[in-house]
């Protein structure tokens, strides 16, 4: 009940508290339990918290909060995965107006075999809607447990609806309001996935460090070898940068929520809608978190050598369990599309002052970067500012070439998202290090600053690679000299 109001049995924890809890639960070492918890506290219940009426909240939330009831979420279908609004599951109002007759199928439903309540996306009168269906409802059948390569302690099943009679009072909001319960919950689910990765990454590093210290080769601990130290250093950088990004993102969302009036009858609806403003940021956390965890696990696996491949050691399970994180809560490809398109929308609407920033970029290219920061990390700050400038140039060139059709240019959108991810992670990390510099000096902690320096240096090179892919796509390999000159000044 971390997001549930106290009156319905929850704790209504702060969003920062939620992030800390996600990190702590994942450090316990059971990704399957993290999955159950994440579904229970995000996609399985947020739709009710934010968009349910008082009677619906009283009926379902106390049991979900106490754990007496398990929650699940039904969105994916055999013919509607990433294109979720293409749902073939339908609800038709009964002749007496008391029920929706639901027909259709859902697949890959986490918590499905155990759940008591299911938030189900469907079409009613051709309009995308969300409804709560309870276990045991006539016409509702739960399929067999899927045999998975990982997350074996979690439940994943198909759901079948055959003339399933669901009371009309189970509809969340009105007919056609399905996007809120479905996608706003997914936004927070994506964030929690990234936040949960932090604890798992810390645990993986702990295992790898302990093993490296104890494992002897050539008469010494393998932790003394440069190649092993490089893997551990990279793992530390990945963990610190993800941690910085998560708390930066949740801090911004908390600020937006704090501006809402708690006495407003629509407070929780508006809180849910607030997540729409942070689609890009939550997608960044999900993509970077799942991919950072994957890279870290691979390094830790390698440190274990042959033992990494043996099930009684910790890295084999971690390797299997993590793979799904790049797929569920929206594939990383889709999240890159969401991230890229969200920023394009903000640029075209004038929300982020894109035209004004382009003028600033021209000044950068003529007179050099000026971040306004004069501290020890000036080079790193300017590296991130250069990445932002490169992003702006690439976005402007993409819009000039493709106009309103830019949304269909997936290679361009994906690489724009890659630049944006680097810039956001780099900015979050540097902001944290600069803000806490006195504390780090006092405690003689040098690792945070080193993490920031290495991350910005390595990713800065990749930014130019992403930019070249974008411009080569636009100009068929013949990039104008003017743009090459701009990039040379920013690189």
Give the residues covered by each predicted segment:
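A structural signal for short hydrophobic beta-strand segments in well-ordered beta-sheet cores
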Residues: 89-93
